[in-house]
Amino acid sequence: MIFLFQEWTELILRWFHVIAGIAWIGSSFYFIALDLSLKQNKGLPDKAHGEAWQVHGGGFYHLVKYLVAPSKLPSELTWFKWEAYATWVSGFALLALIYYAGAELYMIDIVKYDLEKYEAVIISLLGIIFGWVIYDFICRISLKTNVYVLICSIFILITVMSWVYSEIFSYRGAFMQVGTVLGTIMVANVLMIIIPGQKKVVASLIANETPDPIHGAIAKQRSLHNNYLTLPVIFIMISNHYPLIYATKYSWVIISIILIIGALIRHFFNIKHTRANPPYWVCFPIIILASVIFYISDLGKPQLTKIKNTASLIELIPKETLVSAKEIIVSKCSMCHAREPMWENMKNAPKLVNLESSADIINNIQSIHKQSVLSYAMPPGNISFLEENERNLINQLYLSVHNLKNK
């Protein structure tokens, strides 16, 4: 019953998180596109900054933007904030349910630091808080300085945090921790900067005072940051399905490169929304950077002894070697990957992959190879301490099966 409750809770939270994220990202992208497409035509209302005409769903829309505020406040205002809050709350709930509750599987790597669960959770929470505090401090002191200095400072901050996490947590835990920090920065921008600034403007209008334009300038800065951080955060969200991305020694470098690629993609669309010529030149650095990711994802895999893969299965893997490989997999993986898992509160093997017999292992050797030889994804956090020489034996088995199938 506990297992059933956990499964459904996780599923519902994931679904809610995705729905809220779509709503938040959709509205964010829409308003960035709207803002960049505004035209300062003749006949605009007093204090209006620009307007846009749009057609959708069989109707026409006339939108007018006021840079600070209109002369008279309308009776009803629609606030775009709950989407962001719901995304963060559901995301943090997932973090707690999966990564904090199962820290020994998803966060702790005993080879790096043999942390207690509570220690891993505290480090994670402190990292989330300090990530926002340092970012906010950089933005506040850089508001009137060169924008490129600000961008470089934020990039260095995230890169350093990525490296630090990769040295402390498991590869999967470190990757998701960076995503949590970025997501928290984005939501905190809405909760603590953008919305309070807009409320101050509304309060000034109600009091018949002239709103301070600084609130709009700060909100625009933070909104632009959110715009450029969105794609990297989405990438990190879906990355745990691809161990070659998150479970290699240079995964922290991959995050840094993804930050640049995501920013270039958003820059392309931001310029396109202004109706200027799209900057197609961004395709070249994107292709180059993607190639670098492809290369270092292979470079950071476990280092194994090179084996000639021309021999037949029998020549390459003697019976005793096959038995040894099976013994390694059964002893290091089958506490979870079994028809009756021994791991607490685990009813079925992950993805229903059982690794108890020789037939089980041979049938799943490609997945085993990807998770434990091409990356450090399994065992999670290396909780059963799979050594390099043991990964090498698994690699030998994989090569034997591969060669036999391709004869």
What are these regions (language model features)?
Residues 1-11, 101-116, 166-178, 241-247, ...:
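Membrane-interface interhelical loops and short amphipathic "cap" helices
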Residues 1-24, 143-186:
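Long, highly hydrophobic alpha-helical transmembrane signal-anchor segments
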Residues 15-44, 181-197:
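Hydrophobic alpha-helical membrane-embedded segments
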Residues 28-69:
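Membrane-interface amphipathic/juxtamembrane segments adjacent to transmembrane helices
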Residues 67-92, 198, 213-232:
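Loop-to-transmembrane boundary segments
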Residues 72, 79, 92, 99, ...:
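Aromatic- and Gly/Pro-enriched helix-to-coil junctions and flexible linker segments
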Residues 79, 84-103, 162-176, 229-248:
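Alpha-helical transmembrane segments and their membrane-interface junctions
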Residues 144-151, 247-251, 272-287:
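Membrane-interfacial entry segments at the cytosolic side of transmembrane helices
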